């Protein structure tokens, strides 16, 4: 049976994650209140931040930055955007 959550990011009821995606309290909050759809949107945003900012994930500061961005994306005012990113136009 599919687990449904009231998604804090999307503001609607949607399919929940199968397991906490991160360790600790933040992972628990995401598991309890974020949908699969919103998590997939975060993975795309996270990839852009890593690539555009050339983050080295072996660097603890880069990992800490991403954890803060994760929390802001789901529960705050929104994560940073990649500087200079222009979304492709639909032609």
Swiss-Prot record:
Membrane-traversing stretches: none
Pfam family membership, one: Iron_traffic
GO BP annotations listed: cellular response to oxidative stress
UniProt-listed InterPro entries: Fe_traffick_prot_YggX (IPR007457), Fe_traffick_prot_YggX_sf (IPR036766)
Record GO cellular component, one term: cytosol
Single GO MF annotation: iron ion binding
Keyword line: Iron
Keyword presence, Signal: no
Domain of life: Bacteria
Free-text function comment from the UniProt entry: Could be a mediator in iron transactions between iron acquisition and iron-requiring processes, such as synthesis and/or repair of Fe-S clusters in biosynthetic enzymes.
Similarity remark: Belongs to the Fe(2+)-trafficking protein family.
Name under which the protein is recorded: Probable Fe(2+)-trafficking protein
Source species: Paraburkholderia phytofirmans (strain DSM 17436 / LMG 22146 / PsJN) (Burkholderia phytofirmans)
Taxonomic classification: Bacteria, Pseudomonadati, Pseudomonadota, Betaproteobacteria, Burkholderiales
């Amino acid at each position: 049976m599919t687990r449904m959550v009231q998604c804090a990011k999307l503001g609607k009821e949607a399919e929940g994650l199968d397991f906490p995606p991160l360790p600790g309290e933040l992972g628990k909050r995401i598991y309890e209140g974020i949908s699969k759809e919103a998590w997939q949107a975060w993975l795309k945003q996270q990839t852009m931040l890593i690539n555009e900012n050339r983050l080295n994930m072996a660097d603890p500061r880069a990992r800490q930055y991403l954890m803060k961005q994760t929390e802001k994306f789901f529960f705050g005012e929104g994560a940073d955007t990649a500087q200079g990113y222009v979304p492709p136009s639909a032609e």
